[in-house]
């Protein structure tokens, strides 16, 4: 018998799939990544082919073994983390999807969400699920598929169809149809799950006419769900033992195990998630209440706020405005800015997220003078990411009544020292960058490793953690208050501009 000295994380994202093998110290031993196609059948629609996702996952599992030289039988357990909300419906008998998967960003089910609001279900759905009614979540996507794919409703009523988010789909495929499960964190993003009773909500299922026979069984985030079929894992039957949606996996990977701990992942957008402990905190400001993770018989809840534009603002400087050639260059240029921070960029390219929720707003720039330079503009764009993060974190503080002593950060833009220092300054709290920016995959690996006894408990995980770089606030209070006041005025001004064409005869 080979010694089982490794765990594998499968990180199934929106544009690519990755497999990463970690050793007992949480060090990366090998990895593989593969992109897969995105489909945009109509404006605002985003779809994936679930078989292409499965194909990419098979490919990266092989790639990780090849790169690391590790054999499949040396893997103690597999953890899965995934793009959340993306919806697959497949035929129970053939295992074939009935249509493309509808991706979390896709707006094709917006009319269904709008109708639910018109019919007065907002309060009921918020109280039960912790979510706002939106096409973002899986519920309206399932309804859309049942409405638009011929014969789907009838098949669903006859118990012939299964629904799952990507985690469910991958477990079903890896076990060759033996296991149909999901976990608390993914279930809490469907808008069908009662986060208080920890069960699928019959009232919401009836409202949307979704048969409960389609739904996966909901399990904790760290337990053995089933074993890979040997022919799907290169000859080995390995326990699949951890699962969590990507943002919750990052929370766990950042070891935010205590109430009040908070992390910000700076990706294309930025996702801020706060551990609120064993009681769900419903937000008065349209932040999302969600399940962080459930482990050892306990469930930990979280508040989540998202910013639509973070890393994509830096891409805009590079690709749209051509002010920089590479993303890291934004830091060099911003460091050379000479102005008094009088320029404000409000990157509302697709509207404003929490806590403004203004989908009609568009980007704006304020405070330009004849002396404004490219460097000032780049710095203002970076600062906008930090201002938006402060908007969300201040709202979380207000909603939860929990003091926030430290912000843990990860994701691509967290590599930018200037941005992280400004984030600490504007929040007036310490900001700690993860030593290992692979926090999402690491979170999935930890959950799986704990379930199979690879690691003993949370204390052992904490003892392995490397301390990342700490950024401490250095800005005087008066300067901080004035800068943030300017940001709030810039956002207010942005929201007043809504272009309407002049009507005939005006």
From Swiss-Prot:
Binding annotation for ADP = 14, 18, 268, 311, 412, 416
Query: Which segment of the chain is annotated as a signal peptide?
Result: none
Which Gene Ontology molecular function entries are recorded, alphabetically?
Answer: ATP binding; glycerol kinase activity
Which superkingdom? Bacteria
Q: Which reaction does it catalyse?
A: glycerol + ATP = sn-glycerol 3-phosphate + ADP + H(+)
* PTM note: The phosphoenolpyruvate-dependent sugar phosphotransferase system (PTS), including enzyme I, and histidine-containing protein (HPr) are required for the phosphorylation of His-232, which leads to the activation of the enzyme.
Q: Which CDD domains match?
A: FGGY_EcGK_like (cd07786)
Q: Which residues bind ATP?
A: 14-16, 268, 311, 315, 412
- Activity regulation comment: Activated by phosphorylation and inhibited by fructose 1,6-bisphosphate (FBP).
Q: Name one GO cellular component term.
A: cytosol
Name the keywords, alphabetized: ATP-binding, Glycerol metabolism, Kinase, Nucleotide-binding, Phosphoprotein, Transferase
Q: What is its EC number?
A: 2.7.1.30
Q: What's this protein's family per the entry?
A: Belongs to the FGGY kinase family.
Q: What does this protein do?
A: Key enzyme in the regulation of glycerol uptake and metabolism. Catalyzes the phosphorylation of glycerol to yield sn-glycerol 3-phosphate.
Name listed for the protein in its UniProt record? Glycerol kinase
This chain's source organism reads Enterococcus casseliflavus (Enterococcus flavescens)
Q: What would be the name of the gene that encodes this protein?
A: glpK
